[in-house]
Amino acid sequence: MNLRAMQDALRKRRVSNGQLAGLCFVFVWFFVGGIMHFLATETEASIVPPYVPMPVVAVLVSGVLELLGAIGILLPRTRKAAGIGLFMLTLAVTPAHIYMLQRPELFHVPVWALWLRLPIQVALLVLIWWSTWQLRPRRARP
């Protein structure tokens, strides 16, 4: 399904332009992110906290889940379930971001960027919720 087909399907369901933009953003975020789990596996595994066993496996599994979730939000029948899955996955990877803040010397990322990542994570959670769970028909205009 291409972007135009997705837009047409969503418009038939009377989704707001804002929610459509949110869905597109969430799709791109997780689709690109999921691919990066396979293209940069070692880099991704390096941010997994040491208490998580088999970091490479964790990265690969989360990459598959990101790709499945991204594809799932495109389909009206699976959108809500995929949104819940992406929401939970986003919560599940938050300890990696906290670990990076606790040990910034291990990573080649400015500390300010590590701090910025936390509110971005919250905004992403809100966007996932709003664009996948709260789809409401537009009110008819008089």
Task: Identify the function of each model-found stretch.
Residues 2-142:
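Membrane-interface extramembranous regions
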